[in-house]
Curated annotation (Swiss-Prot):
<keyword id="KW-0449">Lipoprotein</keyword>
<keyword id="KW-0862">Zinc</keyword>
<keyword id="KW-0732">Signal</keyword>
<keyword id="KW-0406">Ion transport</keyword>
<feature type="lipid moiety-binding region" description="N-palmitoyl cysteine">
    <location>
        <position position="21"/>
    </location>
</feature>
<keyword id="KW-0864">Zinc transport</keyword>
<keyword id="KW-0472">Membrane</keyword>
<comment type="similarity">
    <text>Belongs to the bacterial solute-binding protein 9 family.</text>
</comment>
<dbReference type="GO" id="GO:0006829">
    <property type="term" value="P:zinc ion transport"/>
</dbReference>
<dbReference type="GO" id="GO:0046872">
    <property type="term" value="F:metal ion binding"/>
</dbReference>
<keyword id="KW-0813">Transport</keyword>
<dbReference type="InterPro" id="IPR006128">
    <property type="entry name" value="Lipoprotein_PsaA-like"/>
</dbReference>
<feature type="lipid moiety-binding region" description="S-diacylglycerol cysteine">
    <location>
        <position position="21"/>
    </location>
</feature>
<dbReference type="GO" id="GO:0045121">
    <property type="term" value="C:membrane raft"/>
</dbReference>
<feature type="binding site">
    <location>
        <position position="287"/>
    </location>
    <ligand>
        <name>Zn(2+)</name>
    </ligand>
</feature>
<dbReference type="InterPro" id="IPR050492">
    <property type="entry name" value="Bact_metal-bind_prot9"/>
</dbReference>
<dbReference type="InterPro" id="IPR006129">
    <property type="entry name" value="AdhesinB"/>
</dbReference>
């Protein structure tokens, strides 16, 4: 707990320092400044959604490196200065980027407009495992609500709309351009939604076991059941009692696949799979991209299609 509050004080101090050194006037639109729109985004989905809207009309920065787990990441003074200098700062929610509310309160006039991409989306509560872990004070960051809304193609559309609205407000001269890009990308997300919906209807099984509670919104949208090994943060480990229940559940439901994510340790998933005679496969949370994915030029929609193909092994989808 002391470490958590110490971190928040450091963040607050950094923002105050940057604010004191920066321009105290309120930021204007991109055109009034005479340069391109500058948007800073926190982690990969926020970057992807924003880039699809802005394209060549602005510069979009990714704050958290794609190879870094974003749940417990905190900004450096350099990161804070980058946010301070931007026109817009796009983040998923205070339940994912838990440092954002403190940072925003600490900033003076002239900072970027903060854009909560999940604004207006009904968030689900965290898992029982998550609450149990935090009751014992074992984790510094609280995810009382599930922040993983971007993993539902339907809710991803809402995030794109939220981001678009703020971009248009900041740079109204390019309104038609941004809205055209947004509509085109949303159409692709709608096609992705149809693909998931059609596949889910063909599934013989509905449950799948994941490394952590990241796919609740996706499961709810398509009538599936996510069975998580741990809570909302991938570095959590289940209690012995929870793991024993999972083993029993997996055997009773003839589970053949345990899903894990590439940018977090797969140790627990590997152990469970070994003990029940299952295999492991990647189910990508899109919290960051691997170097291989980046080299291939893969995007949100590509990887969500890969996720669907991986899920077919558990759901026993009829051809």
């Amino acid at each position: 707990m002391f470490k958590k509050w110490s971190g928040l004080f450091v963040i607050a101090a950094c923002f105050l320092l940057v604010a004191a050194c920066g321009n105290s006037s309120t930021k204007g639109s991109a055109d009034s400044k005479g340069d391109k729109l500058h948007v800073v985004t926190t982690f990969y989905p926020m970057y992807e959604f924003t880039k699809q809207i802005v394209k060549d009309k602005g510069d979009v920065d990714l704050l958290i490196p794609s190879s870094v787990e974003p749940h417990d990441w905190e900004p450096t003074p350099k990161d804070i200065a980058n946010i301070q200098d931007a026109d817009l700062f796009v983040y998923n929610s205070e339940y994912m980027e838990t440092w954002v509310p403190s940072a925003e309160k600490s900033m003076g006039q002239g900072h970027a407009v903060f854009v909560n991409a999940s604004k207006g989306i009904d968030l689900m509560e965290g898992s029982e495992e998550e609450h149990e872990e935090h009751d014992h004070g074992e984790h510094e960051h609280s995810h009382a609500m599930d922040p993983h809304v971007w993993l539902s193609p339907v809710l991803a559309q809402k995030e794109v709309k939220n981001i678009t609205a703020q971009i248009v407000k900041q740079d109204p001269d390019n309104k038609e351009y941004y809205e055209k890009n947004s509509k085109e990308y949303i159409a692709k997300l709608q096609d992705l939604d149809k693909l998931y919906r059609t596949t889910a209807k063909k599934a013989e099984k509905k449950e799948f076991i994941t490394q952590h509670t990241a796919f609740g919104y996706l499961a709810k949208e398509y009538g599936l059941k996510q069975v998580p090994i741990a809570g909302l943060s991938p570095d959590q480990e289940p209690s012995a009692a929870s793991l024993a229940k999972l083993k029993t559940y997996a055997k009773e439901h003839n589970v053949k696949v345990i899903y894990f994510e590439e940018i977090a340790s797969s140790k627990v998933a590997d152990t469970l799979a070994s003990e029940i005679g299952a295999k492991t496969e990647v189910l990508n949370t899109l919290e960051g991209l691997s170097k291989e994915e980046q080299d291939k030029g893969l995007g949100y929609i590509d990887i969500m299609k890969q996720n669907l193909d991986a899920l077919k092994d558990s759901l026993l989808v009829k051809s």
